[in-house]
UniProtKB/Swiss-Prot annotation:
<feature type="transmembrane region" description="Helical">
    <location>
        <begin position="515"/>
        <end position="535"/>
    </location>
</feature>
<protein>
    <recommendedName>
        <fullName>Membrane protein insertase YidC</fullName>
    </recommendedName>
</protein>
<dbReference type="GO" id="GO:0032977">
    <property type="term" value="F:membrane insertase activity"/>
</dbReference>
<dbReference type="InterPro" id="IPR019998">
    <property type="entry name" value="Membr_insert_YidC"/>
</dbReference>
<dbReference type="InterPro" id="IPR047196">
    <property type="entry name" value="YidC_ALB_C"/>
</dbReference>
<feature type="region of interest" description="Disordered">
    <location>
        <begin position="42"/>
        <end position="66"/>
    </location>
</feature>
<comment type="similarity">
    <text>Belongs to the OXA1/ALB3/YidC family. Type 1 subfamily.</text>
</comment>
<dbReference type="GO" id="GO:0005886">
    <property type="term" value="C:plasma membrane"/>
</dbReference>
<dbReference type="InterPro" id="IPR038221">
    <property type="entry name" value="YidC_periplasmic_sf"/>
</dbReference>
<keyword id="KW-0997">Cell inner membrane</keyword>
<keyword id="KW-1133">Transmembrane helix</keyword>
<dbReference type="InterPro" id="IPR001708">
    <property type="entry name" value="YidC/ALB3/OXA1/COX18"/>
</dbReference>
<dbReference type="GO" id="GO:0015031">
    <property type="term" value="P:protein transport"/>
</dbReference>
<feature type="transmembrane region" description="Helical">
    <location>
        <begin position="367"/>
        <end position="387"/>
    </location>
</feature>
<dbReference type="InterPro" id="IPR028055">
    <property type="entry name" value="YidC/Oxa/ALB_C"/>
</dbReference>
<keyword id="KW-0812">Transmembrane</keyword>
<dbReference type="Pfam" id="PF02096">
    <property type="entry name" value="60KD_IMP"/>
</dbReference>
Length: 560
């Protein structure tokens, strides 16, 4: 009959399932090769339904044709060697065949904390993994729709680097075909993870030029290199897009397996998400675009968009562009780039609670400068916010503990007659003015906030490789010596001793096992989450001990 205990156990079981997460401190990516390697011909994966002209160009396996690029546009000999670009926050490689970004490193985010000189690799087009950003010109006259294959661009240099004191870096790739000169321009800014990709079309032919710009992200089905989980709950790995009706719409790999998606949107964005990092194409806000997902002939997943028709009269010039973001999920930056893009920091269905929590945590960090201490202060503030609810819960538990001898007497009196025992217990609760749900409901009310905080600590890139003190050098991975999980288990045991013993023997056994079960689960939890739980437990113990002692003292005084 103990409804409160049943609900509490169920709630703990739900929390256990949601929060059981094992982290892997190996982010599994190698650095970019230091030497120029031959670029393999990559499939552009032109969006379905976009006119490919009358030449029947293949959308899956294009081939490069150097003869289509005139020598006068090539300051150096045409080459298929990758073009290297380095800024203060990006290291990338561009394939001259099509001008796709096929490799990209993030030097400000090391692959591992103990290897600070090996950057995390976001894009790769090697043998083990496929993840790249593609763009091009398709349509009736687009060079990416030619039967001879995608254009082979020429660059003035084989490598480019943002120099000290330089705020912007521009990389131009050039190509000419049938009297039309193309410049594919990559514009980088110091300290920024977004870059502008533009096409300058100079039509020197004797007729009008018509085409469309497309931009897309292509990825295989490999796992997330920045995260690994032990049970069914994981951070989202998949595509997402903006629509007029949904500012953040997920499109998982399973969704793409079931069939292609095609929507007409004005502006918007398309993105690929993984733990801590996001890649997004952001077209001009005024453009009417066709957003599409599909799977190519090699089994890779594609999300992208095709822009409106571009018309360039004979002798005319036109420029079209899109923004590419490839980097960490920094909410303030993402929000500046496009509406809804900050939602790619996926806090789950409780995002509306999680975002204010992160805002508060960020402001605390701006004062303290340490994410560990910030978590502690945030936990104290949240605990203070819910102090009245927690106090009501602990008072109910204290009263339950005070009547525990009477409950034991009822059990001995009625034995296995559960119906009579339940009736007698309800009469006792009524007499003692105890609400059997009084201790549980406040906990359930607080649970959404605690779960939202869990997702904040899990998903925020700011926690990645953030140190606290002493042996805790990374709050996003497990405690290397399991000290915090053991302390957490001890605090759970102490807190359990303050609670009344359940009258049902089975429930009592389950409750006794909870500290052991949670300690085992928390061995692999990120240290930041365990730190939150330890601080929360310590505050709960102090509050519960104080309330319990006061009620017990008042009970003894009344009895005397």
């Amino acid at each position: 009959m103990d409804i409160k205990r049943t609900i509490l156990i169920a709630a703990l079981a739900v929390v256990s399932y949601v929060m059981v997460l094992k982290w892997n401190d190996d982010y599994g990516q190698a650095a970019l090769p230091t030497q120029n390697t031959a670029a393999s011909t990559v499939a552009p994966g032109l969006p379905d339904g976009v006119p490919a002209g009358n030449n029947g160009a293949s959308a899956d396996v294009p081939s490069a044709n150097a003869e289509s690029s005139p020598a006068e546009l090539a300051p150096v000999a045409l080459s298929k060697d990758l073009i290297r670009v380095k800024t203060d926050v990006l290291e990338l490689a561009i394939d001259p065949v099509g001008g796709d970004i096929v490799q990209l490193n993030l030097p400000k985010y090391p692959r591992r904390q103990d290897h600070p000189n090996i950057p995390f690799q976001l894009f790769d087009n090697g043998g083990e993994r496929v993840y790249l950003a593609q763009s091009g010109l398709t349509g009736t006259d687009g060079p990416d729709a030619r039967a001879s294959g995608r254009p082979l661009y020429a660059a003035e240099q084989k490598s480019y680097q943002l120099a000290d004191g330089q705020e912007q870096l521009v990389v131009d790739l050039k190509f000419s075909d049938n009297g039309v000169n193309y410049i594919k321009r990559f514009s980088f800014k110091r300290g920024e993870y977004d870059l502008n990709v533009s096409y300058l079309i100079d039509n020197q032919s004797g007729q009008a030029w018509n085409g469309n710009m497309f931009a897309q992200l292509k990825r295989d089905a490999s796992g997330d290199p920045s995260s690994s989980t032990a049970t069914g709950t994981a951070t989202y790995l998949g595509a997402a897009l903006w629509t007029a009706s949904e500012p953040y719409k997920k499109v998982s790999m399973k969704d793409i397996d079931k069939g292609s998606l095609k929507e007409n949107v004005s502006g918007g964005w398309v993105a690929w998400l993984q733990h801590y990092f996001v890649t997004a194409w952001i077209p001009a806000k005024s453009d009417n675009n066709v957003v599409q997902t599909r799977k190519d002939s090699q089994g890779n997943y594609i999300i992208g968009y095709t822009g409106p028709v571009i018309s360039v009269p004979a002798g005319g010039k036109v420029e079209t562009s899109a923004l590419l973001y490839a980097g960490p999920k920094i909410q303030s930056k993402l929000k500046e780039l496009s509406p809804g893009l900050e939602l790619t920091v996926d806090y789950g269905f409780l995002w509306f609670i999680a975002q204010p929590i992160f805002w508060l945590l960020q402001h605390i960090h701006s004062l303290l400068g340490n994410w560990g201490w910030s978590i502690i202060v945030l936990t104290m503030l949240i605990k203070g916010l819910f102090f009245p609810l927690s106090a009501a819960s602990y008072r109910s538990m204290a009263r339950m503990r005070a009547v525990a001898p009477k409950l034991a007497a009822l059990k001995e009196r009625f034995g296995d007659d559960r119906q009579k025992m339940s009736q007698a217990m309800m009469e006792l609760y009524k007499k003692e003015k105890i609400n059997p749900l009084g201790g549980c409901l406040p906990i359930l009310v607080q649970m959404p906030v605690f779960l939202a905080l869990y997702w904040v600590l899990l998903e925020s890139v700011e926690m990645r490789q953030a140190p606290w003190i002493l042996w805790i050098t990374d709050l996003s991975i497990k405690d290397p010596f399991f000290i915090l999980p053991i302390i957490m288990g001890a605090t759970m045991f102490i807190q359990q001793r303050l609670n009344p013993t359940p009258p049902d023997p089975m429930q009592a056994k389950v409750m006794k096992m909870m500290p052991i079960i949670f300690t085992f689960f928390f061995l692999w939890f990120p240290a930041g989450l365990v730190l939150y739980w330890v601080v929360n437990n310590c505050l709960s113990i102090s509050q519960q001990w104080y309330i319990t002692r006061r009620i017990e003292a008042a009970t003894k005084k009344a009895a005397a």
